[in-house]
């Protein structure tokens, strides 16, 4: 429980929220006849522009034999199109001063360019060419496959990344939601050029594609270019996957490159489409900032870790409430005990000052996000894919403002009724599984009856 120091101000009124509810809603969506959506954040007078294409195709949409194929396609999109080879793609973007980026997630792939507002239309044309007309030259695929295998080696050498991979497996078993986006060494080595072409044809359709622009041009000015570049796509059906079922369990793996214990501990929470704002507030209550209970107690007062984070991840197929950090093997039992004790304590009572802090921290984060066009575009695109609509500024802030202490306490109490998933990499003392099971019993928390101490 966080004590209220004598010099702390009284709990602040709600005016900071009220003053921000009426921020202008500058986001618009237009849908083409084939289902392609044009998402525009209008920024009059802005000298720069952010242009993105989001494809509803990621790791969760892949068959097991093609694990990592979305990520390979993302890499290969820049290696040649119907009108440009790899070098021409790089030159055409860089002669305009454009920054080019792309990434693959579980639920979508993003292709992004940021440049001068005067170059908005050329950037749109380039993205249409790269995303819709890649040629996947065999010689480029052979080279890029090696690059991706090196990237995979980096991931495998990172105890933190391995801990998250093990956590996903403990939480969701063999569901596609648990598979690593980068794939496996065997699947990457086996992918062929025809596999890439087939997968793109299956997944890239109008209903699964969003063209997004943040800059000074209006949607009306952009529509002709979007129609020309993307209007020929077949509409297709939305790429959908059944939600993941939470399993829970323990995964521990020794990682020779780490002298610490990397810990990822979590429980199931609401999916994104279930719109449960109390989950995010609960994560902020427990672990946002140095004065939060997790950091104040486990780091500042007990010195159990340097890095501790609490996050509520709500995605299309599942949600997870996670406490993650790194500690020494000797302090691992105390770190686990302290984390569970704080969760159990907050399932009984949430302090007003912690709720005040969390709400204001989330408010400030929301304001910072408004200043990051790429982040706003991606967040809005995910809303369109999952919810079929945008959540405006007022809706988001009113949802945050509506969360009270009882809502946070109740959400923590509810998540603790489910079996946790725990992943530990690096070093862990002998008997860690049994110790964790004993802690769960002590705090009257459930352990998965199917595989309580899985390895």
Model-predicted segments: where are they?
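His/Glu-based metal-binding/catalytic segments typifying zinc-dependent metallopeptidases
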Residues: 42-43, 52-54, 237-293, 446-455
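Active-site SXXK
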Residues: 68-81
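Short pre-active-site segment immediately N-terminal to the catalytic Zn-binding motif
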Residues: 57-66
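A short, polar/charged loop-to-alpha-helix boundary motif
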Residues: 48-50
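Charge-rich, well-structured scaffold segments of protease-associated domains
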Residues: 1-13, 27, 31, 42, ...
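Short loop/turn motifs at secondary-structure junctions and domain boundaries
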Residues: 19-22
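Short acidic-hydrophobic surface loop/beta-edge motif
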Residues: 28-33, 252-256
